[in-house]
Amino acid sequence: RERTSATTVLTLYYQLGQTDPTHSLFSYAAREIPASVRELIDVVGLSVYPQLHPMGTAADRVLSTLDAAFSSSRIAVTELGYGGQDLNAGPWWFGSASDPVAARTAVAEHVTGAALGRSDAWGAPFWWYYLEDQVGTPGGQVAPALAAVSTGC
């Protein structure tokens, strides 16, 4: 627990619908991450898999709540994915229930846009299944959607 010159990133898994507010991501972080650790964290990110835990229109609110909880750190979506083979059983769809390309594009545009639209944004999300999604698994390439969102083109 010593400060270094390296950027220190903490990633928390976004999970929807905990039994009650005391078990939410934010309650957990407040309870389990002491100030001595918080002061060492440069960036707090969320791991987001909307197929399992949808964020939808709450993306800005969730990121704002994370920002308030970690006010001395920058906020990011540090992990993002949709439609990976181990996620296909997820109960939620985003953008399209039947077209994985449209669904991934919608996820990339919405969540990346919400993350990068913040004044204190720290980079674009890391698309977890990038290689698989880019080289032709069901759902096609994700790079064009990510590039368009990150450059605004």
Indicate residue ranges for each PLM-predicted region.
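Acidic (Asp/Glu)-rich catalytic clusters
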Residues: 2, 30-39, 65-70, 115-120
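Active-site mouth of glycoside hydrolases
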Residues: 3-7, 11-22
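Short, well-ordered coil/turn segments that N-cap beta-strands
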Residues: 4-8, 40-42, 71-74, 120-124
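Aromatic- and acid-rich polysaccharide-binding/catalytic face
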Residues: 10-14, 25-57, 62-63, 73-86
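Phenylalanine-focused residue identity feature
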Residues: 13, 26-28, 70, 92-94, ...
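Short, structured coil/loop segments at alpha-helix boundaries
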Residues: 17-18, 34-37, 67, 100, ...
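Well-ordered, non-membrane alpha-helical segments in soluble/globular domains
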Residues: 22-32, 57-65, 100-114, 145
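Substrate-binding cleft of secreted/luminal carbohydrate-active enzymes
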Residues: 49-51, 74-153
